[in-house]
Amino acid sequence: MKRTIFFLMAILLPLGVGAAQTDITFVVAGKTSNHRQQADAEVQVLNYHFFAEIFLQPSGSVNPSSLLTPLAAGVAVPFADSGYAMEMHGGRYATETELEANYPDGDYIFQYRSPSTGSVRQVVTLGNPKSAGSGLPRAPRLFLFQSGKPVASEHIDPRQDLLVKWSEFQEGGADPLEIMDDLLFVIMADCDGVRRAHSGRPYENTPYLTYADKSFVIRAEQLLPENIYQLSVEHAVLDTSREHDVVGFATFASTTFLDIHTAGKAKPGEACRTIRKKFDAGQTVLEGG
């Protein structure tokens, strides 16, 4: 795990208004690879992607907000409000080489104003955490269990809890700066893209997963019979920093998506056997893919 300390003096000296900021939980800029796991457990690449986000506290606000990338030539890209975060998404690419050409390693500068920070510029520096090769972690492979036994993704019993496990997060590790260890995210959405289960995010006063976790339980009450659900597991390597009392993450991440199907007979009007809306655009299949 690579770590970098940004603006040491800003950390050591009084932060003024920034020391009591109450608007932002964290900001993140990252590169990600997205994959789909087939019913036979084969994992295939879908696309490569760049993203940046500003996550808000429950009563937090940020306006305006934009991002300067290494190739921006001074032209900032505005963030869009998703309802729970300010988001900026780059293109989706068929190869990691294309991703790197459009979003190279370097400084990604968040420009934003919030009531508790005022107008600030926050730098998140993306740099390959490995000495050579791809900085992206291996794509996780998902394993499903019910009643202590492996279960196929097409035959999930909605009356039982579903235990989700994944292949080892080999690149994950603890943060020597003790800001945040490398993270894991598990999400399950229904056929309409509504999130029904989430493993949590840091700094939201709820449990969340790190590289050290090995499994996540989806409760039976979150499953309906005769339905299809969209399941994802993300492994995220972090490079942490802190400015203006706001934590910043530079991340290289890999996500695997898997559709799961519940058995049984649904109540009238509750069956849904096909995905009507993807909950995450990372599932996009590129033309020719």
What are the residue ranges of the model-derived segments?
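Bacterial N-terminal signal peptides
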Residues: F6-P14
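Ligand-binding face of N-terminal immunoglobulin V-set domains in extracellular IgSF glycoproteins
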Residues: R92-F110
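Solvent-exposed N-terminal domain segments of exported/luminal and surface proteins
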Residues: Q21-E98
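Extracellular fibronectin type III
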Residues: V120-Q122, L238-D280
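Beta-strand-rich modules
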Residues: S114, E221-H244
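Solvent-exposed loop/turn segments flanking beta-strands in beta-repeat/beta-sandwich domains
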Residues: F55-T69, F169-G200, E226-Q230, R242
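Recognizes extended acidic, P/S/T-rich segments that occur
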Residues: S66-A94, D182-L224
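Short, compositionally biased P/S/T/A/G/V-rich stretches that sit at domain boundaries
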Residues: A19-L46, V124-E171, G269-G288
